[in-house]
C-alpha cells in the first residue's frame, strides 16, 4: 500500500470509517491481512509478462492489479454491497486503469465514486516510450471518463483543481484540493542515531551532500540531477551526491552515472523505509527535485519540514509551492547549467540556506497536515451523502 494512501486510510479509520483496501500483490506477502479493527487489505493482481517499463516497473502491471481487483469485487459483490454500502475511493497514479476500473467497481456495487488524483495522465503526464504513446489516448479517455462520473474528485493543488474543473467541464463543487503529509510527526522521526546509522551504512563522510529523494522513474527526471552532478564535478565542487530511493529506471541511471565518471561520487541507497527519510533529508545541505512533471511533490513538504532548501524544476504546480528565492530556488526545466548554478549558490551561502528554510518551515503544518486532510475528507463524504 502506498505510504500516502495508508496514512489517509488510517486517519479515516481512526474516525470510525471502515476500509477495504485493494492493492498490489507483491511476492511472499499474504493476500489478505487486517490492520487494526477497521482496515482489511486484499492484495490482488493477474500475472504479467516481465517486460520492463520505466513508468510501471513492468508493462501492464497497474492494469493487472486493476483487473485482479475487479474480479475480486465481482466475486464478492453481494457481501460487499451489504458490508460497505458506502463508496469506492480510487487513488490514481496517472494510468487510465487506476481510475477506470474503480469506476467499474462503483457501478457493480451501486455506490458513489471518489477519485483522488496523485498524478494525472489527463492533465500533465507525458508518454516516454512507444508503448505509452500508443496507449496514451486510451489512458487519458479512461481517466477523464472516471472523473466525470465521480461524485467527488480530489486534486493535489489549486492549479490542478481549477484545470480539472475546466478541462473535464465539472462543476466547482465536485472538485476539491486535498494534499497532506504522511505524518504530522514527520520531523520527530529524525534522530542522531539514525543519521549516524545512515552515514555508516552508505559510507557518507563530512563533505556536503546534495540529495535527491524519491523514485527512480522516467517521470522523476533523475538523469537531470546526474547531469548537474557531472557539471558541478567539472567545476571542481567536492560534493557527495545521494539518491535516496529506487525504481524501474535504476539500470539506465547507473549506466549514465558510469558514463559520466561519477561512480565514486554518487550513492544510490535503494529502497529506504520511511522512518529513515527525515534523517536522510537532514544529512543533506539541500535537495534537488528534477521532475519532468510534478503537481505537488510530497518531498517538497518533507524538506520544508526538515528545514532543507530545494532546487526544483519549474514544472506544473511546483512554483505554487516553492516561492523562488524565498522558500527555495525554481529553475527552468531540463537545463543543466541553471540547475548547477542554483546548487552552487546554495552551497556557497549558508545564510541563504537558513533563510529559505526559515521561510518554508511553517508551510507544511499550516496547510498540509494529515489531521486537517481528514477533517476535509470527512466533510466531502458527508456532502455526497456518505
From Swiss-Prot:
Its EC number is 2.4.1.301. GO terms for biological process: kanamycin biosynthetic process. SUPFAM superfamilies: UDP-Glycosyltransferase/glycogen phosphorylase (SSF53756). It catalyses: 2'-deamino-2'-hydroxyneamine + UDP-alpha-D-kanosamine = kanamycin A + UDP + H(+); neamine + UDP-alpha-D-kanosamine = kanamycin B + UDP + H(+); paromamine + UDP-alpha-D-kanosamine = kanamycin C + UDP + H(+); 2'-deamino-2'-hydroxyparomamine + UDP-alpha-D-kanosamine = kanamycin X + UDP + H(+). One of its GO terms (molecular function) is hexosyltransferase activity. InterPro entries: Glyco_trans_1, Glyco_trans_4-like_N, Glycosyltransferase_grp1. It comes from the Bacteria. Glycosyltransferase involved in the biosynthesis of kanamycins by catalyzing the transfer of the hexose kanosamine from UDP-alpha-D-kanosamine to disaccharide precursors. Can also use UDP-alpha-D-glucose as sugar donor with much lower efficiency. This is Alpha-D-kanosaminyltransferase. It comes from Streptomyces kanamyceticus. The gene is kanE.
Amino acid at each position: 500500500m502506498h505510504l500516502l494512501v495508508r496514512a489517509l486510510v488510517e486517519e479515516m479509520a481512526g474516525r470510525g470509517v471502515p476500509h477495504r483496501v485493494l492493492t498490489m500483490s507483491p511476492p511472499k506477502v499474504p493476500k489478505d491481512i487486517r490492520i487494526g479493527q477497521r482496515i482489511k487489505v486484499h492484495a490482488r493482481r493477474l500475472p504479467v509478462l516481465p517486460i520492463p517499463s520505466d513508468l510501471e516497473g513492468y508493462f501492464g502491471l497497474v492494469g493487472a492489479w486493476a483487473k485482479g481487483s475487479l474480479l475480486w469485487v465481482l466475486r464478492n459483490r453481494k457481501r460487499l454491497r451489504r458490508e460497505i454500502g458506502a463508496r469506492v475511493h480510487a487513488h490514481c497514479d496517472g494510468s487510465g486503469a487506476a481510475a477506470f476500473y474503480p469506476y467499474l467497481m462503483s457501478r457493480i456495487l451501486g455506490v458513489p465514486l471518489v477519485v483522488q488524483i496523485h498524478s494525472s495522465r489527463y492533465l500533465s503526464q507525458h508518454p516516454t516510450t512507444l508503448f505509452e504513446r500508443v496507449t496514451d489516448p486510451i489512458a487519458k479517455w479512461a481517466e477523464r471518463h472516471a472523473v466525470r462520473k465521480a461524485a467527488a474528485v480530489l486534486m493535489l493543488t489549486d492549479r490542478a483543481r481549477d484545470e480539472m474543473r475546466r478541462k473535464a467541464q465539472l462543476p466547482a463543487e465536485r472538485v476539491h484540493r486535498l494534499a497532506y503529509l504522511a505524518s504530522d510527526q514527520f520531523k520527530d522521526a529524525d534522530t542522531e542515531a539514525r543519521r549516524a546509522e545512515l552515514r555508516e551504512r552508505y559510507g557518507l563522510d563530512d563533505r556536503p551532500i546534495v540529495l535527491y529523494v524519491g523514485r527512480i522513474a522516467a517521470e522523476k527526471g533523475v538523469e537531470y540531477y546526474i547531469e548537474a552532478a557531472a557539471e558541478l564535478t567539472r567545476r571542481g565542487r567536492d560534493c557527495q551526491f545521494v539518491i535516496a530511493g529506487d525504481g524501474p529506471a535504476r539500470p539506465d541511471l547507473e549506466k549514465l552515472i558510469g558514463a559520466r565518471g561519477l561512480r565514486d561520487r554518487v550513492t544510490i541507497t535503494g529502497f529506504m523505509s520511511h522512518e529513515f527519510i527525515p534523517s536522510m533529508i537532514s544529512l543533506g545541505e539541500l535537495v534537488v527535485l528534477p521532475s519532468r512533471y510534478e503537481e505537488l511533490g510530497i518531498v517538497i513538504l518533507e524538506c520544508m519540514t526538515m528545514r532543507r532548501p530545494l532546487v526544483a524544476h519549474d514544472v506544473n504546480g511546483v512554483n505554487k509551492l516553492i516561492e523562488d528565492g524565498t522558500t527555495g530556488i525554481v529553475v527552468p526545466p531540463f537545463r543543466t547549467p541553471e540547475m548547477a548554478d542554483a546548487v552552487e549558490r546554495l552551497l556557497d551561502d549558508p545564510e541563504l540556506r537558513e533563510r529559505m528554510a526559515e521561510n518554508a518551515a511553517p508551510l507544511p503544518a499550516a496547510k498540509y497536515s494529515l489531521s486537517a486532510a481528514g477533517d476535509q475528507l470527512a466533510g466531502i463524504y458527508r456532502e455526497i451523502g456518505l
